[in-house]
């Protein structure tokens, strides 16, 4: 199931009784702050998980069209690691 920021703001609006515009601004601010922090350092949200930027090293690859070897450039990836509590909650709900 995919959930959008708009759906999250609508859920907040209905649960908290705030206007949808206010909840949308809150959700956008939270996500942009998470992104800004995660770009610079590891971000851990207690009982949820951690966001961390990892640098992938350059590696050899193959161009599928020409079959010639190429070097794949290094790049940064955002990695999410769920907390043990979140994993337990997910596994509990699957039973």
Curated annotation (Swiss-Prot):
GO terms for molecular function: DNA binding; structural constituent of chromatin. One of its GO terms (cellular component) is cytosol. Keywords: DNA-binding. Gene3D superfamilies: IHF-like DNA-binding proteins (4.10.520.10). The keyword DNA-binding applies. It comes from the Bacteria. Disulfide bonds: none annotated. InterPro entries: Hist_DNA-bd (IPR000119), IHF-like_DNA-bd_dom_sf (IPR010992). Belongs to the bacterial histone-like protein family. This is Histone-like DNA-binding protein. It comes from Rickettsia prowazekii (strain Madrid E).
